[in-house]
Structures are given as C-alpha cells and as structure tokens.
C-alpha cells in the first residue's frame, strides 16, 4: 500500500495534531524525535515537549529547534522534578492546542507520512482513537531490525492487538494517565489505552508497521528482557519480511539507524538492508 494514497478523499482532515513528547536527559534521542516530527507531511501540527530536565537540557532542546528552523515546538517545564511519567503526560495533554493528540516518544521514530495516514484512517472509521497493530523494532547493540505484529497473525483481537505507544486520538477530557502507583511510572500508556478502548470506537491501523520504529537503546523505560520478549512473541515470519522487503528498504531511509542492518524474523536472519 502506498502510505500517501488516501483511503477516500472525503476522509482528509485539516484539524491540528498535537504531538506530545515527555523527555528528561536523553538529548541525542530527543533531537532525532524532533527531526522525525519536522519531516512529517501533515501540515497543521505542533510538538509539545514536557521535560523535568535541568535548564541546560531545556535550552539545548529549544536551541536545536530554533537553529534547525523547526516551527511549532514548545518546551514546557512542570516546575518539579518529582512528577511521575503519567503526570508529565497529563501536563502535555493540558498544554496541547490541537483537536487530535498523538503520543510522540523521545526514542521512537515515525515515517514522514505517519501523522497523515493515521489521522486519515481514524477519520475514515469515525473513531475516537487509533493505534497501530504492528511496527518496526530496532534492537541495540546487535543492530537488528524486526517487524512486530501485536495481532500475532490475527490470533490476538480487540485490545490485545494494539501497540500502546502508537496512540492517536481526538481530544477527550475524560481520559487521563495514572499519576500515582506503579502504573504511573511504567506501563502508563497501556493503562491509558485500556481506558480509551473501553470508552470510544478505536480504529486499528493494520499492515503499516513500516511507518513507526520502536527502538531499544539501553535507557528505555522497559528492560531489555521486555523488548526481547516482544520480539520473541510477536516478530513476523521471514516469509512475511521477504514479501515486504521493498517496503522496508524504502521506509528505512527515513530512520536514524546504522546500515548495513540485519532484518530478523521469527525464524532468524532474513536479509540485510544497506
């Protein structure tokens, strides 16, 4: 599928999309996520960055955006360094100006067509929210790339087929991330997804996982074991990867990962991208 091809011309949207990033002290990663935002083809958008990092870090983010000429970025400091991840995400929602919200993690990357395609899909299905069912996953330091399918070839349906970090939704004041307890610091996006899924129509975005790259780099919220378990349980087969090799070769041009890159399916190495 051509990701830029509209599902239906009537399903185009011009609503502002607010991309919401929470970050602290991962400057190199945050810069790449900002660049990913800057390269989006969807025109009416903003990037709201909420950080409890120190002033030099905040200044570095602002300077990077200004020097690169990237418009529509706001860097906000909550005034406290003791807030949970869930509380910081809620601050980003409150600060958003758009009618559509999109989670924009500082260590994941989106294809330039991601916002346009997901917003169009959500509108076409008259949904309150949308999540990908599949995405790319890059594992360091080995440097291998996989295509993760949360639906597990269709065996998972409903909530279990959705990738929580890929949220896009219409603004809705009913929904907030947990701000206390263990879920407020890790897994808050899964809890939020459960709440949204139970309350509004959700449009799963299937088969377009090349539009989103999930990266393990050693400083993620979740452990290496978690990321490897995601790969072991949900990696697409080598045959599926070979079928979509041309799509992968084109998509990988937009992602900041080293080449050559080994593409690995559930049976092992499939091919190499240069």
Model feature map: region roles:
Residues 101:
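Short aromatic/hydrophobic "clamp" motif used to bind/position activated sugar donors
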Residues 185-192:
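Acidic donor-binding loop at a coil-to-helix junction in glycosyltransferase catalytic cores
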Residues 79-96:
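Glycine-rich, basic loop-to-helix element that forms the pyrophosphate-binding segment
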Residues 35-44:
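Short, acidic, metal-binding catalytic loop of nucleotide-sugar glycosyltransferases
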């Amino acid at each position: 599928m051509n990701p830029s091809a509209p599902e239906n011309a009537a399903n185009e949207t011009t609503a502002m999309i607010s991309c919401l990033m929470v970050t602290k002290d991962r400057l190199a990663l945050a810069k790449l996520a900002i660049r990913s935002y800057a390269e989006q083809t969807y025109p009416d958008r903003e990037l709201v960055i909420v950080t409890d990092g120190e002033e030099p870090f905040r200044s570095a983010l602002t300077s990077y955006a200004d020097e690169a000429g990237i418009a529509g970025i706001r860097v906000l400091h909550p005034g406290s360094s003791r807030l949970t991840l869930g509380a910081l995400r809620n601050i980003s929602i409150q600060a958003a100006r758009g009618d559509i919200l999109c989670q924009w993690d500082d260590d994941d990357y989106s294809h330039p067509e991601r916002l346009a395609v997901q917003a169009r899909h959500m509108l076409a299905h008259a949904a309150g929210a949308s999540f990908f069912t599949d995405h790319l996953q890059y594992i360091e330091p080995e440097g291998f790339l996989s295509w993760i399918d949360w639906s597990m070839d269709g065996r998972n349906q409903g909530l279990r087929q959705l990738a929580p970090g890929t949220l896009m939704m219409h603004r809705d004041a009913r929904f907030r991330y947990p701000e206390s307890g263990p879920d407020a610091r890790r897994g808050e996006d899964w809890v939020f997804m459960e709440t949204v899924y139970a309350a509004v129509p959700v449009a799963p975005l299937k088969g377009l996982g090349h539009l989103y790259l999930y990266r393990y780099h050693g400083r993620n919220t979740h452990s290496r074991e978690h990321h490897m378990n995601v790969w072991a349980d949900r990696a697409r087969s080598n045959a599926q990867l070979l079928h979509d090799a041309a799509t992968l070769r084109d998509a990988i041009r937009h992602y900041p990962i080293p080449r050559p890159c080994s593409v690995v399916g559930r049976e092992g190495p499939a091919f190499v991208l240069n």
